[in-house]
Amino acid sequence: MTMTYAGTTALITGASSGLGAEFAGQFAARGSNLVLVARRADRLEELAQDLRSRHGVTVTVLPMDLGRAGVGRELFDSLAGRGITVDTLINNAGFGTHGPLVEEDPDTIASEISLNVAALVDITRAFLPELLASGKGALVNVASTAAFQPIPGMAVYGATKAFVLSFTEAVAHETKNSGLNVLALCPGATRTEFFDVLGGESAAVGKMQTSQQVVGTALKALGRKDTPGSVVSGWVNRVTAGFAQRLPRAVTVAIAARAVQDW
């Protein structure tokens, strides 16, 4: 099913920068009202004011830490109390860590799993009935090309994104013919603040795409008559992901380890 933008409402997590902010801009340009969620209230307000003035859409800002239990129901109830129903959900919030597992901080690992996996599932479950009732929008979960193979040096991050890909493709099948477009977006290295958290651009492999290119890939997929369950952004990334799925597992792990050995 193709997307409806004008007059609908899109909820975007991790909206204060990077892919989240780009999704917000491109949806607003198409006439979507927005709910922007992230921890940084000042960044959200700045973005919201810009989008309101440029596109004349309604933008609701909800500063919130998503990395805790029950956040899906909390977010849903907060919007219901404001009379806001959601047509499109974009689960973009997440972060990655970089380095051998034995050197990782256990609390950071727990936070990474909570935000990248638990919060995404919780928010999806909370809003899915409303998304299905609307039938005019989409569920977009941001995965990664890291989902296609284990990555020594990014073991936890890669595993969380493999979960997101598997989970989203399953939900896409469960909801087929419902009118809801369900998509796992798998970008490769992208020019965002993600790498500030990860440990610098030395962790990136190959030429980075821009946020605009990645979001453009998602919108193109959502515009298809039959939206695929997942899409990889960038032809080099598509080729690499394809090889990762066809080569022996031990080979893909060794290649991935070499690709991130700069740390």
Model-inferred region functions:
Residues T9, S16-S17:
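Conserved glycine-rich cofactor-binding loop
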Residues P100-I113:
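Substrate-binding pocket helix/loop in short-chain dehydrogenase/reductase
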Residues S166, A172-V236, Q245, R249:
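SDR active-site lid
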